[in-house]
A protein has these predicted regions:
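Basic/aromatic-rich interaction segments and small domains that mediate binding to polyanionic partners
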Residues: 2-63
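Long, low-complexity intrinsically disordered regions
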Residues: 62-73
């Protein structure tokens, strides 16, 4: 669903993203077949907006602990 927070399930080195990074769904394609997802720093700077398949994301679980890491320039 749009504006849901998701977890990336695989590394995307070309975008500077790692499995476990959190993103926000900004657009849903084909009833959940794919998603446009925005990944931002804690300061609000956009790192990437990427099109992902349903297999590349998963919903967050309320018993998970978020983790912070520095972005790679």
């Amino acid at each position: 669903m749009e504006l849901d927070t998701i977890v990336l399930t695989e590394d995307l080195p070309s975008h500077g993203l790692k499995a476990g990074d959190l993103g926000t769904v900004v657009l849903v394609h084909g009833e959940g077949a794919g998603y446009e997802v925005e990944f931002v720093t804690l300061g609000g700077e956009t790192v990437a907006v990427v099109t992902l398949s349903a297999a590349q994301v998963r919903p967050i679980s309320h018993d998970e602990m978020p983790h912070a890491r520095a972005t790679v320039p």
